[in-house]
Amino acid sequence: PIWSSASVGGLPLEKYPGFTQKLGQDTFIRAKTSGAEMIKKKTGAGFAVGVSIAEVVHAIALDGKRILPVSSVQRGCYGLREVALSVPTVVGRGGAEQTLEVELWPKEIQALKRSGAVLQETLGKVLAEAN
């Protein structure tokens, strides 16, 4: 999770009364697993996905130049190349037009790079098995 840019009412989350690293980690895990949990309970997560897709389509169709957390193949953002990751991206008529590097804590950059390496390794294995 990227906590360095998270805020509530303009106050950095790490300074928010009652916020702890444990609470942040618990919240992250719950958010990460909630989609699967909703599907298990047969309530589905389709509405949220539909809203997100509508936002992206709207930004493209109207050349909205919206900053959205969309996945695209990285070409240097945070030193990452040839791996698809979700980062803040300007979305307009040309699709994912520009990725934006927000300031991250060093440990967040390292975690992002580890994620990129894991994705590249997994993709390599999938492609090797497909051939």
Q: Where do the protein language model's features map onto the residues?
A:
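C-terminal substrate-binding/catalytic lobe of Rossmann-fold NAD(P)-dependent dehydrogenases
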Residues: 1-131
